[in-house]
Amino acid sequence: MVSSTSQIISTSPSRDDVVPSRKKVTLPPWLEVAKPRLIPLLLATTLGGMALSEGWPLPSPRLACTLGGGALAAAAAGALNCLWEQDLDGRMKRTSSRALPAGKLSPSAVFTGAISCTLAAAALLVSGVNCLAAGLSLLGLCSYVLLYTAFLKPRTSQNIVIGGVAGAIPPLVGAAAATGHIGLSGWWLFALVMVWTPAHFWALAILLKDDYRSVGIPMLPVVKGSVFTAKAIAQYGWATVLLSCFGVFALPEGGALYGILLVPFNVRLLQMVRRLAADPEDLQRAKGLFRWSILYMFGICLLLVVSRSTLADQFHNQAIYLFTNMGSVFSIA
């Protein structure tokens, strides 16, 4: 089994090619520990939570404070994650050159920066948005660092299923920023991100399973293998597609346009999931699914925003008119 796996890996693309941008772009150490590549998607889902609310569009100052505070909280979470896992990162080839294991930054400097970002995020959100948004952002930070990184990740192969709550909180922050409370629509996007996360992350874990195995992290592909993981990805992929359709009802307006534009996103996601299920050991297929899953969630959030535009309102009204007057439209005089 070991020899066959080695043969597959030797004829597959190098693991260094999983996320090429990490090799091509060298970030300053203080920026690297903030994990800036993760922040745009978190902010996109925050915008999605806003777009689902009756308070959309937000006043520009409140919008800026929400996104700025969210970015600071995410940066703090990334830095604390790097701080917690510095020994682990130092033992993996892929991460050994990161700022902390390589000695480019001191742990005390990273901790000070993380606390400063946390305080700045809280101050910005409390003063410029509301206490609920601030509290939710801090909850997301704590759940990522304490629940996922410190507790779940080293203990269970279902770590990302439960720990995915951290990445699903930004839509709630967006909803809270827009209206001061969390409605059913905000909880729908929270649930969508939760069920999307395992398929997204396990595709990456298939690519990096040897790294995780080398340091004893029980990611699902390490514990159950790529074939089992691909089946689990398919299940969560279908759940994501089905749950995404409820956005038609979650949107206050523009649901019809959202539903139409959603179709190609879901079709492509299912195609990528099916390709991986057909050959779970193909690293290119796993990489393709991982990348598309990111674009998929960006696309969902973009559709939510577009569906709340004036053009979407006009489309929605025309669709309702045609539906309610279908008899007269197609009647023959």
Swiss-Prot record:
It is found in: Cell inner membrane. Its main location: membrane. Its EC number is 2.5.1.141. It catalyses: heme b + (2E,6E)-farnesyl diphosphate + H2O = Fe(II)-heme o + diphosphate. Signal peptide: none annotated. GO terms for cellular component: plasma membrane. CDD domains: PT_UbiA_Cox10 (cd13957). GO terms for biological process: heme O biosynthetic process. Gene3D superfamilies: UbiA prenyltransferase (1.10.357.140). InterPro entries: Protohaem_IX_farnesylTrfase (IPR006369), UbiA_prenyltransferase (IPR000537), UbiA_prenylTrfase_CS (IPR030470), UbiA_sf (IPR044878). GO terms for molecular function: protoheme IX farnesyltransferase activity. Keywords: Cell inner membrane, Cell membrane, Heme biosynthesis, Membrane, Transferase, Transmembrane, Transmembrane helix. It is an enzyme of class 2 (transferase). Residues 1-21 are annotated as: Disordered. The chain crosses the membrane at residues 38-58, 63-83, 109-129, 132-152, 160-180, 188-208, 245-265, 286-306. Carbon 2 of the heme B porphyrin ring is defined according to the Fischer nomenclature. This is Protoheme IX farnesyltransferase. It comes from Prochlorococcus marinus (strain SARG / CCMP1375 / SS120).
